[in-house]
């Protein structure tokens, strides 16, 4: 088995902030054409044989996807080297002219209690055996929304289309808001999703790590820099790293403008000692 292709620091920072990455397997196009044909035989226009959780026994060739070094490296990077595959999986069809879904978070299959977590304990792979340009109805995601328990305001956190190449896959934090977009073409579009679980707390970086500093480029809608920094440190196996802050904008904590309010909250979150004086204002926000 080939060595996993681990994510870089920049890719991990983007995953922490945005909650997803668009990647591609190293498997040849001929393999993906074969998978497309197998999916078509199961759930194409003339068939209704969706195997549900029995997808791997029905299409055992899919094991090659999960042995792919890019897939293994991506999963190792975000959920640790001893991750496990959950028994729930699904094969989805987006036929020509089908309508878009409503934006949603997936439920945790088999769990009666809420297990959502900002930390990356669950991840999902969404693999497509054919290219998914915008007109073919790719998966739409709201970058950064894995930190939001309620559907985000579209004016603050807009949706983007995760257009993939043939054999591409979407690596997502399990709690990200997403949906199937409308297929405007006469082409069939299939997607399979598998879930993966972290088995232990990180005790060090599990990706190709060189730079311990948190930095980011493109903002995914809202600036949650204090949250991102904490997740980054947790994934590195590091303790809490308080950062010096200037005077905290106390009035901003209760301002009607969500961006000013969030900036003030970020300042408080960066330094626990400075936050103590503002606990009443923070409690009032709950």
What are these regions (language model features)?
Residues 1-115:
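Non-heme Fe(II)-dependent double-stranded beta-helix
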Residues 93-95, 144-148, 195-201:
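Short edge-strand/loop segments of extracellular domains
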Residues 99-163, 205:
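Catalytic core of non-heme Fe(II) oxygenases with the double-stranded beta-helix
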Residues 163-178:
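Conserved metal-binding segment of the jelly-roll/cupin
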Residues 179-251, 257-270, 275:
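Non-heme Fe(II)/2-oxoglutarate
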Residues 256-257, 286:
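Short inter-helical turns and helix N-cap capping residues of alpha-solenoid HEAT/ARM repeat scaffolds
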Residues 276-282:
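Short sequence/structural elements of tandem HEAT/ARM alpha-solenoid repeats
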């Amino acid at each position: 088995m080939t060595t996993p292709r681990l994510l870089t620091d920049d890719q991990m920072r983007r995953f922490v902030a945005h909650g997803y990455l668009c990647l591609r397997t190293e498997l040849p196009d001929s393999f993906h054409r074969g998978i497309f044909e197998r999916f078509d035989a199961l759930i194409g226009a003339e068939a209704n044989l969706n195997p549900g959780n029995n997808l791997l026994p029905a299409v055992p060739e899919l094991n090659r996807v999960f042995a792919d070094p890019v897939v293994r490296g991506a999963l190792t990077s975000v959920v640790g080297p001893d991750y496990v595959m959950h028994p729930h999986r699904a094969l989805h069809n987006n036929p020509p002219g089908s309508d878009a879904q409503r934006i949603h978070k997936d439920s945790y299959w088999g769990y009666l209690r809420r297990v959502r977590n900002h930390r990356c304990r669950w991840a999902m792979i969404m693999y497509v055996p054919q290219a998914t340009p915008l007109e073919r109805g790719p998966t739409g995601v709201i970058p950064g929304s894995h930190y939001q328990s309620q559907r985000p305001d579209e004016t603050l956190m807009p949706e983007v289309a995760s257009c993939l190449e043939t054999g591409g896959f979407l690596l997502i934090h399990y709690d990200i808001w997403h949906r199937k977009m409308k297929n405007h073409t006469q082409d069939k579009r299939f997607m399979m999703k598998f879930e993966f679980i972290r088995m232990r707390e990180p005790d060090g970086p599990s990706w190709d790590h060189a730079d311990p500093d948190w930095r980011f480029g493109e903002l995914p809608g809202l600036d949650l820099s204090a949250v991102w920094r904490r997740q980054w440190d947790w994934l590195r196996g590091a303790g809490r790293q308080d950062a010096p802050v200037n005077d905290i904008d106390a009035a901003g904590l209760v301002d009607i403008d969500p961006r000013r309010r969030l900036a003030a909250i970020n300042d408080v979150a960066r330094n626990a000692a400075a936050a103590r004086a503002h606990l009443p204002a923070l409690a009032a926000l709950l």
